[in-house]
Amino acid sequence: MRPATLEFIKQQFTGYYQRVYPVTPDALLQREWGFIFFDAGREVRMRRHLAFGERQELTEYLKTMVPAHVFYSSAYYESPGAPTMAEKGWSGADLIFDLDADHIMHGSYQAMLARVKEEVQKLLAVLTDELGFSEKYCEVVFSGGRGYHIHVNDLAVRSWGSAERREVVNYVCGIGLDPGLLIRAGTDLSTGWPRRYLGALDGYLAWLKVKNQKDALLHLSSIKGVSRSSAAGLLKSLDQVRATIGGDHPEKVLGDRVLRAVTTNDNPDWKKRLQETGVQADEPVTTDIKRLIRMPTSLHGGSGLRVVPLTISEVQEFDPLIDAVVFGDRDVQVTAEKTLTVSLLGNTYEVSAGTQTVPEAVAVFLCCRGLAEIAEGR
């Protein structure tokens, strides 16, 4: 990044922190803070093990230091500013889920943001409808980058260790499912993982049905434990098997030896389908009881977008490419290395290779993402 570009971004961030009073997490006195600063060097370094006694102290720090990224601990500590983790005195942590589009799909920035929001809504439904968390304890935060964080601030989970959090994220993501326990006679198969599992299985069989039969036979017989003859038998009985899944006793299909072999991790196509049925959350974030997470209302140094806190009711209508933009439309000259398209503020901007004038918000976005530089002699 050129010095002029770095200075431009810092000026924009400075202006933002001068005019905004940040939202701070509950129990500010018990939180550790970490910051990454604008630096011309390539090595990214975080300054952490910091603590603030009051909101105004943090506000002045942001105004003075103007960080590129702002983080605080999901954990609560007796001495959050202690220089080592052992000295901090852990006393609990919020339950955090991280949904990052990079782990879900690849595509345009706009498409990735739309796709990851689907996962947010899926996760919220699981948390509230199946795991019983109250909506008032669930906060959604747009990360300012490619995803969202969901904070569960329920006192009932604060003392949980990594093992308990692992159980929750395993359920949410559908890891280690035992179909024999899920799909049993007399259980409600219309909700939760029983419904999702049967839906995934029916979808997989429907995929086999429309697939070229030679390719379907080759696919099935390549799975460990499935012979060519047994694969052919399953293909011939697909309609009957699917009818059983949709009938009164879907648990009967679990007795089929071929289906048991097909629905294991040895079958990557089934594994992927089942994974997509669950929530595609970043598991290590949830199990980490000392995680640093982005501060809502701060700016993301990799995009220039605001880290936006949301209630559950606000998620549906939220558009990060409009609602997380905090900069204006004054003209700024930038130089792009290649032609690209940017969707921002409800408009689509065609940016050509070379030097041109774009709105300030677009300039910040492009420069933060490393897609353009401030034009020389602007």
UniProtKB/Swiss-Prot annotation:
Its cofactor is Mg(2+); Mn(2+). One of its GO terms (biological process) is DNA replication, synthesis of primer. It is an enzyme of class 2 (transferase). Its EC number is 2.7.7.-. InterPro entries: DNA_primase_S, DNA_primase_ssu_euk/arc, DNA_primase_ssu_PriS. GO terms for cellular component: DNA-directed RNA polymerase complex; primosome complex. It comes from the Archaea. The active site is at residues 98, 100, 282. Keywords: DNA replication, DNA-directed RNA polymerase, Magnesium, Manganese, Metal-binding, Nucleotidyltransferase, Primosome, Transcription, Transferase. GO terms for molecular function: DNA-directed RNA polymerase activity; metal ion binding. HAMAP family: DNA_primase_sml_arc (MF_00700). Heterodimer of a small subunit (PriS) and a large subunit (PriL). Catalytic subunit of DNA primase, an RNA polymerase that catalyzes the synthesis of short RNA molecules used as primers for DNA polymerase during DNA replication. The small subunit contains the primase catalytic core and has DNA synthesis activity on its own. Binding to the large subunit stabilizes and modulates the activity, increasing the rate of DNA synthesis while decreasing the length of the DNA fragments, and conferring RNA synthesis capability. The DNA polymerase activity may enable DNA primase to also catalyze primer extension after primer synthesis. May also play a role in DNA repair. Belongs to the eukaryotic-type primase small subunit family. This is DNA primase small subunit PriS. It comes from Methanosphaerula palustris (strain ATCC BAA-1556 / DSM 19958 / E1-9c). The lineage of its organism: Archaea, Methanobacteriati, Methanobacteriota, Stenosarchaea group, Methanomicrobia.
